[in-house]
Amino acid sequence: MSTASGEVATLPAAPTPAFMATNLLVCSMLWSTSFLFIKLSGSINPFVLASIRGLIGASALALWFVVQAKSFRPDNGQWHHWVVLGALNGWIPNVLVAHALTQIGTAPAAMIQASGPLLVAVLSHLLYADERLTPRRFVGVVIGLAGMGILIGPTALPDSGISPWGALTMVATALSYAAANLYVRSIRHADPARLALGQQICSGIPATTLALVVAGPSAFAAVPGSAASLLALGIVSTALPILLFMRLIRRAGPTRASMVGYLQPVWTTIMAVLFLGESIGLRELTGGVVVLTGVALVSFSGRVKAIR
């Protein structure tokens, strides 16, 4: 996966089924723990939480670079890629998720975020000639959007007990991740590990700046009380899965890599029930199943294409 500074990363022609299965399972499980650790972090300001998450994630990846004796410098001066990914795949969704989880449960939030592959498929159809929507994928998108309607629709009803802002915030989160997935595809000859490091650096620094401006230094006083959860959030839920995910996108393309979103709500729901004591209603379960059915049709059709 990694190369020395200045070298061009050499990638296999296509990912093997074993590579896909292993990386999808591990990456989705690790990423799913983020919902759990955010909930366990208590009432920390979303900007502060995004700040600490980004800084810890960057520190963990930087330590990995030191151990590997790798250079921190961007490939071919690609600082702009770091900044874009730090926003789209870093501090923006981190803030949005932290805010949304103060409004809705972890399982519904993960199910809404699972719409990411649907957004990736539609945007890929518009942007890339080799990612056109086949009839099967089109049906999958329609089914997935119907599932989103089941999940989000009741927020428009009075006394529904469901936060419309929480649901819409998770939709915005899915859109941000989808845009990041597509942007990664446009990056050529970059080391995925270095992209992951740059993303976290350019996620933690802006989030810290915004936290100081929006919430003030006093908002960081709550951090020591949730140190264990935040440390796990930065390493287990951020540094490790983003490293795997960058590699997955470069090997399998944005549409196949976004299948992580297909598995994430399953892990999140299990964790929410086991560790947070949340209950899943029939509407959430039905909507989630419909969304994932659409995602499956979108993601498991056609052949896997390598990204060179």
Place the predicted regions along the sequence by residue.
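Glycine-/small-residue-enriched transmembrane alpha-helix faces in small-molecule transporters
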Residues: S2-S51, A87, V95, H99, ...
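Specific transmembrane alpha-helical segments of multi-pass solute transporters/efflux pumps
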Residues: L30, S34-F35, A62-Q113, G149-I150, ...
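Hydrophobic/aromatic residues within transmembrane alpha-helices
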Residues: S41, L49, R53, A100, ...
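Helix-helix packing/entry segments at the starts of transmembrane helices
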Residues: S28, I52, G90, N94, ...
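Hydrophobic transmembrane alpha-helices of multi-pass small-molecule transport proteins
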Residues: L61, V83, V122-L123, P135-T155, ...
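Transmembrane alpha-helical segments that form core, pore/gating elements
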Residues: F37, L61, V120-V122, L126, ...
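Transmembrane alpha-helices of multi-pass small-molecule transport proteins
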Residues: S2-T3, F19, S43-I92, P117-L123, ...
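Structural signature of hydrophobic alpha-helical transmembrane segments
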Residues: N45-G57, H99-P117, I162-L175, P224-T238, ...
